[in-house]
Amino acid sequence: MNNKMNFRLILVIAFAFILCNCGSNKRDSLEVNITNGLINAKLYLPDADTGYYRGVRFDWSGLIASLDYAGHTYIDQWFDKYDPYVHESVLGPMQEFESIDFNSTAVGNPFLKVGVGILTRIDERNYSISKYYTPVDLGKWDVKTGKNFVEFTQILESQIGYSYVYTKTVTLTKGKPELKMTHSLKNTGKKTISTDVYNHNFFIIDNELAGPNIQTVFNFNPVGTGRGLGDIVEFQGNKLVYLQELTRGDVMIQSINGYGPTPDDYEFRLENLKTKTGIRVQCDRPLSRLRYWSRNTTYCPEPYIAVFAEPGKEFTWEYTYTFYTW
């Protein structure tokens, strides 16, 4: 009798051990760590059931959970409450493609968000970034990883004329304090894909709150209008500086102008003057629009580029993030 009980106990323990291991492996499969010896970064991987982000606003790929260089940190949770389906439960340099065919689509019919999939228009109101539009087809994601890179590929084959292969590769450059995001959008459908994409750049450098220790330096002298401009922040030459700490509410500069038509002006530096570190952001495509948003826990230049791919064609672009100290 004792032998039987011992045998059953061993089976129960073994089964529990297997379950625990399976669960931990599945959890581990949703994130990956990469390094080039200078920069260390952790990325969350896309998954419709258990992914960190399951909202319908931002591109699901390339979500960087944390990044450190030379003893400094650049990405952390900036929002108060986490919910995988909330539109802003994202971190780091996240991209959003503007919706395609939303305005011409009747309620109950589908529209496209590149990097998310085919979604359903749920009411007559204008498109809202905070609204959850019911997914119809989220496509198929494939992920490849290496020591210093993660490659994300989404394949979408829809019934509404839009199909594509979208690839984003996040790479830590060997021997440099540099991160590159390279993109390819291959139009495999019948309709032209024409939209804008921007990078929200949810940075929080060394956990410094928005205030006089934070500044953004542009490649041109910016001008613009918006909420908080003049009392909380102001333009000083080619810089955007904080006049005081941002304790509540937000800053929203809807339109920043002054840039030229070449990629040279898609360059800015986000700096923490207190800890003497910063991030330089560049792109190989020209700006189509530029905004700036901030709350007390993050400061976000929002640069847009135009994306255009006719059927059978491919559109490419690349962001470069360089981390530095002084």
Residue ranges with predicted function:
Residues 13-23:
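Hydrophobic h-region of N-terminal signal peptides that target proteins for export
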Residues 2-10:
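Bacterial N-terminal signal peptides that target proteins for export
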Residues 8, 16-18, 59:
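Compositionally biased, low-structure terminal segments
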